[in-house]
Amino acid sequence: MKLPIYLDYSATTPVDPRVAEKMMQCLTLDGNFGNPASRSHRFGWHAEEAVDIARNQIAELVGADPREIVFTSGATESDNLAIKGAANFYQKKGKHIITSKTEHKAVLDTCRQLEREGFDVTYLAPKSNGIIDLKELEAAMRDDTILVSIMHVNNEIGVVQDIATIGEMCRARGIIYHVDATQSVGKLPIDLSQLKVDLMSFTGHKIYGPKGIGALYVRRKPRIRIEAQMHGGGHERGMRSGTLPVHQIVGMGEAYRIAKEEMETEMARLRTLRNRLWDGVKDMEEVYLNGDLEQGVPNILNVSFNYVEGESLIMALKDLAVSSGSACTSASLEPSYVLRALGMTDELAHSSIRFSLGRFTTEEEIDYTIKLVRNSIGRLRDLSPLWEMFKQGVDINSIEWSHH
């Protein structure tokens, strides 16, 4: 077993060796290096064929028509293209958008930008387990609502939203529904031929493909229109210009092909490992599970260890690559906005750790993790005056700290 142990698969994944192998065949002179838009020679045709195969592989995993898959530089761009693209195209119908407070920053900050441009955005607060209350969503819908953006799986706590029902609600009212499926694709079954979802964002690097490549699903029946955000040669049916990076696309396609084949067995294995990890730490005092094991994706476990400062905990766990909050916001010392939106205190949000497991996680690593966490928590609490006061029965919240 090598240290440190990687338990941050929700931030990114290593590229699967089978994916890397395929990608390397699309780079050098003796490989498939052509520009797929070059229609006048064999190099272009071969490149275009490779892109078509990958587009099919992605469409097959999610039950879409390959013509509905638009390649982008990643899920952040897909979220931007979907939300800005739909808002700009349909703004004559209305300027109201609904999303939730626990969305990824790529959705929240895009909505903030649209607010600056005169759109009206409603941010729903989820229930304490992270699930959106569908009655609240329904109550928020208005005649001028044009777009709802609610993710499939939350990147910090792993809870799964009921996108099928939300889709039905939106379709019944003629509202466009966008789903950020970054954390769910390849982990949960997605069938866009059944779901009433109009726009869906994907990425390569959360599912053992390369970074820098993603896709946006844009429904054809009923036809959804979006305004391009990137202009140029009119690639990708005019929705996203730019030369297609064949090696990245082939990598993403292969990753999605593997996911389709291995998803069921892999998720069963990860569920067992995640439950083993939770069973190993849940009997400690003042340990709380964030999210919902029943309504959660099998590879994420988010736990708060009360009376332990999150940053010191991460330092104590330096043999584990884990995060508090998401990678995108973990650089700031603010407590996770997702956990705060669940109604959690700053202290508890600050003491939370996200363990995310993946394809190369072993049982041995999980057992080592349990041992390390138990030892570290015990040691850090021994050093904590707050823990001592708690053990003596002092209500910490009733203390009035003097300001210096």
From Swiss-Prot:
One GO location term (cellular component): L-cysteine desulfurase complex
Known pathway: Cofactor biosynthesis; iron-sulfur cluster biosynthesis
Binding residues annotated for pyridoxal 5'-phosphate, in chain numbering: A75, T76, N155, Q183, T203, G204, H205, T243
Localisation: Cytoplasm
Cited SUPFAM superfamilies: PLP-dependent transferases (SSF53383)
Cofactor(s) the protein requires to work: pyridoxal 5'-phosphate
GO biological process, one term: [2Fe-2S] cluster assembly
One Pfam short name: Aminotran_5
EC number of the protein: 2.8.1.7
Disulphide linkage map: none
Keyword Transmembrane helix in record: no
Active site, per annotation: C328
Domain of life: Bacteria
Protein residues bound to [2Fe-2S] cluster: C328
Assembly: Homodimer. Forms a heterotetramer with IscU, interacts with other sulfur acceptors.
Family: Belongs to the class-V pyridoxal-phosphate-dependent aminotransferase family. NifS/IscS subfamily.
The protein's role, per its UniProt record: Master enzyme that delivers sulfur to a number of partners involved in Fe-S cluster assembly, tRNA modification or cofactor biosynthesis. Catalyzes the removal of elemental sulfur atoms from cysteine to produce alanine. Functions as a sulfur delivery protein for Fe-S cluster synthesis onto IscU, an Fe-S scaffold assembly protein, as well as other S acceptor proteins.
Protein name (record): Cysteine desulfurase IscS
Gene name as annotated: iscS
